[in-house]
Amino acid sequence: PSDGTEYEVVDDRVFQAMCDTKTPQGVLSVIRMPHYTEEEVLNNGKTPLLMVLEDLQDPGNVGTIIRTAEGAGVTGIIMSRGTADIFNPKTIRSTMGSVYRMPFLIVDDAVAFVKRLKERGICTYAAHLHGVHSYREEDYTGGTAFLIGNEGNGLTDDMAEAAQCLIRIPMEGKVESLNAAIASAVLMYEAHGQRE
């Protein structure tokens, strides 16, 4: 190509060995993944709307949250070190390209990070089965961070205690909770709607 991009045509067997999917699309690329600083994620000129993911294990959930976050106007994703790898091929596929546009940060101590958010005036809301208020009762027009926990165990006690407010998504029937990505979408779009 005229833009200087290098490419190479390889044999089908070689291509198959390079891919991690059974039915690859026929194009493979190697790119440098973006890296962000805490300041870049928190101070991008917009009122913060953050997702804090604590120990989510399913790469598909992480990718879906990132994709949905871009659509809902989220300004950054914060992930604990125990969260599924953002560079996992399944995560990247699930983002449908949003991973290249959504600022993210991987932190060693997510609880300490949440405490720093509060110091910056960002209100932290933990999605929690024991939430006192329905998510619809809160104001997300200011700096907001939603805390989402592990698919099987939810948020750790330390993370829930670090939050300023425990919120819940009301459930009908015998369902206790929603999938982490779906719960995240509900919260992100509530904030998006309040900010329109």
Each language-model region and where it sits:
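N-terminal positively charged helical leader segments and presequences
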Residues: P1-D20
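RNA substrate-binding interface of SAM-dependent RNA methyltransferases
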Residues: P1-S2, E38-G131
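Short coil/turn connectors at secondary-structure junctions
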Residues: T5, P24-Q25, K46-P48, G73-T75, ...
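General small-molecule cofactor/ligand-binding pocket signal
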Residues: Y7-V10, L105, I167
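Hydrophobic alpha-helical segments and helix pairs
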Residues: V14-L56
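Structured adenosyl-cofactor binding patch, chiefly the S-adenosyl-L-methionine
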Residues: G26, T68-A72, I86-V99, D157-E196
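Active-site/ligand-binding-proximal alpha/beta "capping" segment
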Residues: Y125-V175
